[in-house]
């Protein structure tokens, strides 16, 4: 007999699941052993023994507290039969673990059922990160508006409450959401993620809500884009978000081939009719950093009024208005996206205002918008200072946190970091400036080794010169995989400089492109 059926999910809701002891037995089996708190040098056998004790004693007490709506997860009284220091500290953590995993299992069952929905208006396509650059290079020149921002995860109370509005649209169980909100209010710090090179491991429940929030963020944008184009019925809802969502009109037209026989007519209608009315809206996202490029049509002001302003107010958490001075200062600035700088240059006559009954739409005529081929050296130095590899002026310093590794691991960390940076920015026009980054990483590695062995830099240099000198990465390109190409031959002016094929960015490089 199944524990839960889909009919009971829809009829009774998910709140009664917390009163089933069999459900917590299932949760206990699926719990990750890495989340179990280990105090001191306790043997694993004792830990498993206490785990069984908690299963038989605390589950019934937990269900009883949930029934009384008096669930306090850190104020649990001791049991007289097992009054030990280890057990007292462990059972407080056990309440948190069992509740978090219970919610995680229930929410996973909900979203597994939601994946089978047929009317999900979203196109979510998995692409390599480098496919964004040639796309932007072709599309961004003709676009009028460029919206660049980051998705903020639960930094304010309003955004935290907005998460429960999203959950209520999917679940419709007030008692279940009320219990979830009380638990997350106590553990709100788990839902905030910081992007550094050394990422701390979040609990599985917080990662679930993070992916949920990004999923709803993408679905909101795509829903209004497709609603504006009147192409919602042609979408393929089976696609799922992985790491990089990439949306454009051609991807929508590819789905027409599977369901429509008269493809040329539909493509002509999409290219002529819909483009002339609403223009094109292109959207690229990498993790929490996103960019929207809008090409105007006849009714682009209607889209801006009913969709984009609502999107900015609800999702980004700040008010948006069509102020001339605000938009002029905003679009006159250059900004970084995926580690490259997008340059904006305006004409002298850059605004054309037309009076309309509801508002005064502003039409921008921008010139010279392009992706700069120059590597942002000062931004890279700033990222290295965040990683404590140099100061703000670019002077190398030692990394004390990495001194606990052995010598080979330390040299491999610095070598891989430099190799990834060389590979990512190998097509830049000022790639000779990579010598500054090489100098910082090379001497930071030397100082880290000298700090570990408590010796001078001169003696450390003479000892590890053959192994730490990263100059061979640039000279001997034939020994380093994909950096073995002749850069002068490949990156001529007649060729595109987007010749990278990174399918996934390493953790060591993610710090540079995500902390814009």
UniProtKB/Swiss-Prot annotation:
Family: Belongs to the intron maturase 2 family. MatK subfamily.
Transmembrane spans: none
One BP term from GO: tRNA processing
Highest taxon, organism lineage: Eukaryota
A Pfam family of this chain: MatK_N
Keyword Transmembrane: no
A single GO molecular function term of this UniProt record: RNA binding
Localization annotation: Plastid, Chloroplast
Chief place of localization: plastid
GO annotations of cellular component type: chloroplast
Intrachain disulfide bonds: none
Function per UniProt: Usually encoded in the trnK tRNA gene intron. Probably assists in splicing its own and other chloroplast group II introns.
Keyword Plastid recorded: yes
Family matches, as InterPro entries: Domain_X, Maturase_MatK, Maturase_MatK_N
UniProt keyword terms in alphabetical order: Chloroplast, mRNA processing, Plastid, RNA-binding, tRNA processing
PANTHER family: MATURASE K (PTHR34811:SF1)
Name of the protein this chain belongs to: Maturase K
